[in-house]
Amino acid sequence: MVGSLEVSKPPEHKVESKIVIADEEEEDENDSPIEEVRLTVPITDDPSLPVLTFRTWFLGMVSCVVLAFVNNFFGYRSNPLTVSSVVAQIITLPLGKLMATTLPTTKLRLPGTNWSCSLNPGPFNMKEHVLITIFANTGAGGAYATSILTIVKAFYHRNLNPAAAMLLVQTTQLLGYGWAGMFRKYLVDSPYMWWPANLVQVSLFRALHEKEEKREGKQTKLRFFLIVFFLSFTYYIVPGYLFPSISYLSFVCWIWTRSVTAQQIGSGLHGLGIGSFGLDWSTVAGFLGSPLAVPFFAIANSFGGFIIFFYIILPIFYWSNAYEAKKFPFYTSHPFDHTGQRYNTTRILNQKTFNIDLPAYESYSKLYLSILFALIYGLSFGTLTATISHVALFDGKFIWELWKKATLTTKDKFGDVHTRLMKKNYKEVPQWWFVAVLAASFVLALYACEGFGKQLQLPWWGLLLACAIAFTFTLPIGVILATTNQRMGLNVISELIIGFLYPGKPLANVAFKTYGSVSIAQALYFVGDFKLGHYMKIPPRSMFIVQLVATIVASTVSFGTTWWLLSSVENICNTDMLPKSSPWTCPGDVVFYNASIIWGIIGPGRMFTSKGIYPGMNWFFLIGFLAPVPVWFFARKFPEKKWIHQIHIPLIFSGANVMPMAKAVHYWSWFAVGIVFNYYIFRRYKGWWARHNYILSAALDAGTAVMGVLIYFALQNNNISLPDWWGNENTDHCPLANCPTEKGIVAKGCPVF
C-alpha cells in the first residue's frame, strides 16, 4: 500500500524508463522529433508514485477556490490583476513538504466501501504537485460566461434567474470535455502536437523537484529560478506602484506635445507606437503571454502580420478617411453614431421585449466603428478561412494518417517515447466518460436555454448549431495551438453566424458565442493539460478526475463571486454614477457589452451588408481562404527552401488579433523579447537556452504576480498612495492620440479642426 512508505526516508525517485536506448539510431526513434521537447522533457517515469493523495485534494482544492475568487474579484476593477497558477505552484511546494513531515500516516476509509487513503503516503512528489497545479490553473482561468451575467445586470439592468445563470456558467465550461475526448488522440498522443507553453511548466517542475549538483561556474536550476523570482518581485514595485508610466514609454509624444498627428504616430497605448516600449514584464506578457514560450517561427509570422496590418493597411485606411475614419478616435473599441459621439443604445432598445426597436434605430443612426476595430473584425473573418485552408493543405494528410493509425491494433507502437511510456504504464480514460459529461452538459444547457422563461433568448437549434461549430473547429484550431502556441479565436465568427440567423437579440448572441467558442477554448485547455500530464507521466484517469472536479468547483466559485459583487457593489460598472475614486469600472466587460451591441442588437445584417457601413470587410473571407494556396504551392515546388515552410498564413492574419485590448507598446515589447531569446540566444547559446529559458519565463511571471498581489493588499487596498507626479500616472502621456481629426467633430480635451 502507498501509505506504508517511510516518511522520514525519502525514496530514490530516479527510476529510469524501461525503454532501452541501444544506439544512436534507436535513440532517434525513441525520443521526440521536436528539439525543444528533447531538450526539456525527460524520458523517465516512476509509475509507483502516489498521485491522488490527501495532499493533492486539500492543497489543490484550496488553490482552485482562492485563485477563482481572487481573479474574478480583481477582474471587475480598473486595473485587473490576474494571479497565475505559477504562484500556487510555488507556494504549495513548501506546504506539501510540510504536510509530508507533520501529518500522521492514519488511513481514512470511506464508510460502506473498501476505498481508503492515507493522510501521509510518503514524501511529497512531483506528480502530486502537477495535479495541484492543474487544480490551481483551472481556478485561475475563470469562467467566461460570468460576463453575460455582468452585462445583463450591470449594463442592461435586467433580472436573470440565478439557477439559469448557474447552469449557463457550468455548462459552457463542461461542454469542452466532449470535444477534448474526441480529439485527444490526435492532439495529445502525436509527438508533433508538442504544446510549447507546457514546456515552461515542465522546466519549472524539474527545477523545483530534481536534485542537482552545483557545477563550478553554473547555477542550479532552482537557484536560478529563485534569483530571477526575487529580482522580478523586487523590480515590479517600480512599474506597479512607484513609476507606472515606465510601462508605456512613448518619446514622440514628449517632443510634440501639441500635435495630434505626432501623438497618433508615437503613442504606444492609443496610436501606432513608433518608438514606444515598456520596462515592465506585465507589459511584455500581460496580454500576449510570455514570448519565451512561443517558438521563433510563430513570433516571426505574428510580427509580420502585425507590421503589415498596423503599419501599412491601417494608416492607408485612416489617412485616406475610408469609412469616415477621421471622425472617430484612432484606437478604440467603442461604437459611435454618425455625429462622432458614443452610440446611445437606450434609444434603439425595446426595454419590454429586450429586442431592437427598428423604427427608433432608423430614425437615430447606423452604427460606426473606429477603422482599427472594423479592420480587426475583417482580419478575424480572414483568420477563420485561412485556418481551414491552411490546415487542410498542410496538415490534412497528416491528420488523416493519425486518424487511420488511431484505429490500428498496434497503437502502442505509435508515437514517441512519451506516448509509449504512458500506454505501457497507465490505463486510458474510457471514451464513455467524455461522452457522459458531454451528454449531461448538453441536456442541462438545453434546459438553461429553453427553461426559465427563455431568459437567455437562445433557442434549441441555436445551441445545436453552437455545438456543431465547436465540433468542426476544435481540431484545426487545436493543431495550430499545439504547434505554435497561438490561439485562433472564433468569437467573431460565432457572433456573425447567430447575428445573421437571429438578429436583434443581444443575449442570444452572447450565449451562442459562449457555447460555441468558449467550449472550444475549454476543450483545448483540457487537451493542453492532458499533454502536460503526458510529459509529466500523470495517470490519464487521475488527470480527468482532477480536471472535472476543479472545473465544477471553479465555475461555482466564479458564479458566486460574480453574483455577490453584482448584488452588493452599488452602481458597479457604471462609470457615470460611481465615485471618481471607485475601482469598480469593469474594463473587460465594457468590451463584451460593446460586442453585444454590435452583433446582438444591431446585428451583422445592418453592419456588414449593403444596409450597413462595412460590407467591404467580407472580402477578408475570400482573401483568407486563398492566401495559404500560393505558400503551399511553392513549398511543394521548392521543398529545399525551408523558409517557405515556415510561412504560416493563419498566424499572419491573427498577428493583431489581441487588439484593441493589447496596444502597440505591448506588441513591440513582446516581439523584442521573443526575438532576443528564441532566435538569438536559442541559436548562439543553445545550452543556456535549454537549461534556463522556460525557468526564466516562469520566474518572471511569478515574481511579478506575487508583488502585484502584495502591492494591492498592502498599499492600494488601504488607500496608501504616493504624491501626484508625472511618472505616477498610468498612461503614456499622449492625451491627443485619441482625438478625432475630421473637421467640425467636437471631443472633450481635443482641438476642433
Curated annotation (Swiss-Prot):
Role summary: Involved in the translocation of tetra- and pentapeptides across the cellular membrane in an energy-dependent manner.
Membrane topology: Multi-pass membrane protein
Gene this chain is encoded by: OPT5
Entry's localization field: Membrane
Protein species of origin: Arabidopsis thaliana (Mouse-ear cress)
Main location: membrane
Gene Ontology CC terms, in alphabetical order: membrane
Tissue: Expressed predominantly in flowers, and at a very low level in leaves and roots.
Biological process annotations from GO: protein transport
One Pfam family here: OPT
Family: Belongs to the oligopeptide OPT transporter (TC 2.A.67.1) family.
Annotated GO MF terms: oligopeptide transmembrane transporter activity
Listed transmembrane segments: 56-76, 80-100, 132-152, 163-183, 224-244, 296-316, 368-388, 432-452, 461-481, 506-528, 544-564, 583-603, 615-635, 662-682, 695-715
Taxonomy, superkingdom: Eukaryota
Protein name: Oligopeptide transporter 5
Record keywords: Membrane, Peptide transport, Protein transport, Transmembrane, Transmembrane helix, Transport
InterPro entries per the UniProt record, alphabetical: Oligpept_transpt (IPR004648), OPT (IPR004813)
Keyword flag Transmembrane: yes
